Amino acid sequence: MKKAQKANAERERLEKIIVAVLKASREDLDVSRAELADRLGWKPEQIAELEIGRRIVRAADLILIARALGIEPEKLFHRVMRW
């Protein structure tokens, strides 16, 4: 496998983990997609798109979502790295 292919495969793997951690964190806190969207000023569909992988989670989104859930962003990053 070429370096670029390996990098893309690793990126896709990490994106899936990030999405899984965000969704699990939201569900652990018993926060609905609609409630999280409201806290962020987003539409519930935007949360759904993130959680099903149709939208890439940018670093800024990750930080905003963590704050909206009342979680320190560092803890989310740590959870991603342990997944």
Features from the language model and the residues they span:
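Short alpha-helical DNA-recognition segment
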Residues: 30-52
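N-terminal flexible/basic segments that precede or flank functional cores
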Residues: 1-24, 28-29, 67, 72-78, ...
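The DNA-recognition helices of helix-turn-helix-type DNA-binding domains
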Residues: 43, 54, 80-83
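Residues within the helices of the helix-turn-helix
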Residues: 23-24, 34, 45, 63
